[in-house]
Amino acid sequence: MFIDPVALRIGPISIHWYGILFAVAAVAGAWLATREARRRGEDSEQVWSMLLVAAVGGIIGSRLYHVIHQWDLIYRDNPALILQVWNGGLGIPGGVAGGMVALFAYTRVNRLNFLRWIDIGAPAMLLAQAIGRVGNFVNQELYGPPTDLPWGIPIDQAHRVPPYTNLDQYPVQTTFFHPLFAYEALLNLLGVAVLLWVGRRFARRLYDGDVAMLYFVWYGLVRTLLETFRTGNWVVGGIPVAILIGVGAAVIGAAVIVIRHARGMGTPGAYLREMEERRAAQAQATPPAAPEPAEPEPQAG
């Protein structure tokens, strides 16, 4: 069963499932980030401004990654297709990089703690990625090798990559593929739970930025695992680029956590301490309640 990528047509306007899911993912991620910001004592209203800025940077970065990936196959001869984002084709590694650059610029301009805010955004990012992966099902992207498992999915001829373009050997009606996008979505949801748990369980021991580094470790390992099964990989030097990025992200994320803690390059539980200091300051600034007047003693008579 194949789904029409266009969810709704209104005259000349086509609304694609990919765009709808992108919007749902962004709102869901912002909702979670808002809750995390409040829990950490930050201004939750900043989340929506950051969402717009990070979304622009993320779309540019993810599209650029995809275009470079598919340049020889698609865009060299059809450069006009580069701007047709609604047809799919967004690379998450590029999106993360673009969003991080945009968010760094926003926090610098507004004098906010960049590391603390990417901690707030890390679980939200995984949630958004999990939801966005459903779009890969609609667009028939991010699938693995053929499988006989009951949850295998069909892929039509137009979206096949070699050697699965040979329909005599891999008929459309009887060949089903691993839904790698679904595996990633489930692992991302598990990652959301892990990051939220770590952020709460070890709050007094974590430095600002630790949760974000854990995001890179988690997602890097997930992508490395799944890319070993993916078809149509972008390969450099015989190694899929996504695996290089995944391994690099996981190693760097883990190294940053270990080195910072070994050298004491941070303040454990910084946001908790600041919240406690603010509460203490507010308590001192609040004048004590005036004592109630004593009731007159009854006269003897």
Regions found by a protein language model. Give the residues of each.
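A feature for loop-to-transmembrane-helix boundaries and adjacent hydrophobic helices
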Residues: 1-301
